[in-house]
Amino acid sequence: MTPLMNTTNDLTSENKSTQKSRRIGNVVINIGLFIAGLCVSFGIAEIFFATWESYLLKTMGVFVPVDPKYDGAAWEVDPMQAGRFVWQADGNSIVHIRSKNKKLMYELRPNAEISEIIKINSGGFRDREYPKEKPSNVFRIAVVGDSVTFGWRQRLEDTYPKKLEALLQNHNTPNTQFEVLNFGIGGYNAEQEAELLRVKVLDYHPDLILIGFCPNDGQIGFDGGLWWHFFHGPSRTVSFIRLMSIYQEYKADSLFLLRRAYRDILNISQETNIPVHICIFPMIQGDELYVTPGFIQLLEQLNLPYFSLVPLFAENDYKQLMLDTVHFTVAGHEFTAQNIYEYLVRNKIVPLSTSEIANN
């Protein structure tokens, strides 16, 4: 082979190598441009969906705080004037744990304690320790609800469930014991309350279940956006897709969450033969007390017994009974307990003698 031919072959090989390198380079550039395009598109989508997400949340009445990680430093100074908890990145707080139950989303942390004011028992609810097995001479009432029932900014003994327990104990003979267990959890809505009823409350074998209903229990977001903290994903796009599925139901029926939850509660009552009574609490809106439109009609359709405290609050100086738009002062808790007590006795919902308890 002549030197000229060798040179030609070398040039051909170099050209092929150069062309191959160019092709690889072009592929890399195209992939890079494609990825960059995806990033830009995703960024635009995030901005777009964030805008529409805000619109949907506003339409659905969801309250979203600017920063869901509340400043809980005040708890260390004055727990009675605080009431907010620092949420960690893993979805926990000093008194909350992220629940394995997707319907509950979060629960109270067993044995959590804050400055002698907030104590969570080993069962994961704010009350004294109670055995799951109920003694034979005890009539046990389970109270389920949100932060109003929990006792926002109040001591346990000042909450309406414990005041109701004291009233019932004073009414009967020494041999008769009443237990009123407080299963309230701040931020829970009606569906979470129904799920809590099924997976935890029934384990304590209650004879009667009371559900404290607040008008915001039917909203998608409630009590300072706790729901939002657990529902919101790292991506606005993913969050928007989730939110749209809920919005479609909300748009079709503004009571869809309450309707679904209270049907479940009714089923639980029928399955277990445990009576359930709904206590309807007020919410201040402007200068008036707000009542969820259609809720009482829903309860009547389901044949669920209820007792509304709204007119009773309206007849009194309700601003002295309310700590804010939904939560009660100590006087408000006492007023609520007294009226629930009278409702239970007047309608003979609770036994009034030892013999009646024995036969229950």
Across the structure, where does each feature detected by a protein language model lie?
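Histidine-centered active-site loop/cap adjacent to the catalytic His
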Residues: 33, 44, 49, 322-360
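N-terminal Lys/Arg-rich, disordered targeting/topogenic segments
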Residues: 1-26
